[in-house]
């Protein structure tokens, strides 16, 4: 390699189109590397456009990006393979001639880009931001809300059946334009108006009766389809980076050779906390992150209702234009007291000021998490964290030292921990 390295970052979405955890990390890493190396970012947007199926060259904050505009609706791995994305990615490889291709996610990217990158002669690195290569639902979280303790690649429960297609054939034209029943079911469940929610759920039920319930399809066929694709990724990547030891152990138990996967904590962008002026009588709790059901915002609101007027809860997050997330927020926030303040989307460059306005950050996720950037940002800003006692969250937060643990999914226990801090502010 020469005095600089040609690096192609690959991720499902990227700012300014989306700025959630893995996208922010990819952006910060790319900015840092670009001070010395030739760094470009290949990403996808499934936002409907007038001219979909094209590869555009753009610039975001000085970073060169190759934006693959597909305009499709994706249900994760149900859409493998994607010939257009494969062709666009090959164009990016030919244009950039990278020495290193660094993957961050495969949602909406198809199953064969890792193999395509390897065939180009580049070294292939894959940072594991979630459990997507061993779980079709990405979170090791069943659709009934229970955690999955998967530690065997052959263990494949039918807990997320609608996300896995049992063959690699093309979808019919109508199916390409209509969201899957899985999406309609989620959309129905998160409708804020009860009458509309019941009507949509009934319609989805009729559609499942007529077209067959995906939950009754052959688990073995879906397991074989899923694991065939992911084993190829295990084989063709040169190195996997695991930001938590918990995640590393899960991947090793499910087939990644231990010598190919390294535990390394996320590198973080330094920033200064902007302290607020004057003390406040009420403790300020904060949630910073996406408004997705598995993030536990509903659990946090339930716990907070027991605090009365002794604290405030500030929620920083965005639905990013998603009707599902927007409806979810309207439903769970219906009738909330004024001590809950929803700030909406935030610019991560303001994280120092946001943390400066908070006394405690709460990470109430219902899944294991990996190595939440929010927790690490809170620690940089000197803010303690209350989080669940499982997975990567518990690994980061030392109970009673730099934060508190509560029993995952237990609103009463979370309320107890929040009350403890309200009543003992000097802790």
Residue ranges of model-derived segments:
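Donor nucleotide-sugar binding/catalytic pocket of nucleotide-sugar-dependent glycosyltransferases
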Residues: 133, 153-273
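Glycosyltransferase donor-sugar binding loop
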Residues: 312-329
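Conserved acidic donor-binding segment of nucleotide-sugar-dependent glycosyltransferases
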Residues: 399-400, 404-411, 420-426
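A conserved mid-protein helix/loop that constitutes part of the nucleotide-sugar donor-binding site
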Residues: 24, 292-306
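Short alpha-helical segment that forms part of, or immediately flanks, the ligand-binding pocket
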Residues: 352, 370, 375-380, 394-395, ...
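Nucleotide-activated donor-binding/catalytic signature segment of Leloir-type glycosyltransferases, i.e.
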Residues: 326-349
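Short hydrophobic beta-strand element within catalytic cores of glycosyltransferases
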Residues: 363, 375, 384-387
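N-terminal subdomain of nucleotide-sugar transferases
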Residues: 1-54, 61-64, 94-96, 120-123, ...
């Amino acid at each position: 390699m020469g005095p600089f390295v040609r690096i192609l970052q690959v991720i499902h979405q990227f700012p300014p189109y989306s700025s959630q955890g893995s996208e922010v990390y990819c952006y910060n890493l790319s900015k840092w590397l670009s001070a010395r190396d030739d760094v470009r970012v290949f990403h996808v947007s499934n936002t409907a456009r007038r001219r979909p199926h094209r590869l555009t060259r753009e610039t975001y904050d000085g970073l060169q990006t190759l934006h693959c505009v597909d305009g499709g609706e994706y249900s994760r791995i149900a859409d493998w393979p994607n010939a257009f994305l494969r062709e666009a990615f090959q164009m990016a490889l030919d244009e950039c001639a990278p020495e290193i291709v660094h993957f961050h996610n495969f949602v909406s990217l198809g199953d064969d880009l890792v193999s395509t990158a390897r065939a180009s002669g580049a070294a292939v690195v894959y940072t594991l931001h979630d459990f997507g290569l061993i779980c079709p639902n990405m979170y090791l979280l069943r659709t009934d809300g229970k955690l999955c303790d998967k530690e065997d690649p052959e263990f494949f429960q039918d807990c997320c059946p609608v996300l896995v297609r049992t063959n690699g054939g093309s979808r019919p034209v109508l199916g390409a334009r209509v969201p899957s029943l899985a999406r309609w079911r989620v959309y129905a469940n998160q409708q804020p108006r009860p009458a509309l929610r019941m009507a949509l759920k009934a319609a989805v039920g009729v559609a499942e009766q007529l077209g067959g319930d995906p939950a009754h399809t052959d688990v073995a066929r879906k397991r074989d389809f899923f694991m065939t694709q992911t084993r190829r990724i295990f084989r063709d990547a040169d190195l996997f980076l695991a930001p938590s030891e918990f995640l590393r152990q899960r991947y090793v138990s499910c087939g990644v050779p231990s010598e190919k996967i390294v535990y390394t904590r996320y590198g973080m962008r330094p920033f200064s906390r902007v302290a607020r002026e004057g003390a406040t009588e009420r403790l300020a709790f904060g949630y910073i992150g996406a408004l997705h059901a598995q993030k536990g915002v509903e659990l946090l609101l339930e716990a907070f209702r027991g605090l009365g007027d002794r604290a405030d809860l500030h929620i920083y997050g965005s639905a990013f234009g998603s009707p599902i997330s927007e409806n979810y927020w309207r439903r769970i926030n219906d009738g909330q007291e004024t001590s809950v303040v929803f700030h909406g989307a935030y610019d991560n460059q303001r994280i120092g000021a946001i943390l400066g306005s908070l006394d405690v950050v709460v990470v109430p996720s219902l899944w294991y998490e990996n190595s939440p950037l929010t927790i690490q940002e809170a620690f940089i800003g000197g803010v303690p964290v209350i989080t669940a006692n499982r997975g990567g969250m518990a690994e980061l937060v030392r109970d009673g030292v730099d934060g508190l643990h509560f029993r995952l999914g237990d609103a009463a226990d979370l309320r107890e921990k929040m009350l403890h801090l309200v009543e003992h502010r000097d802790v």
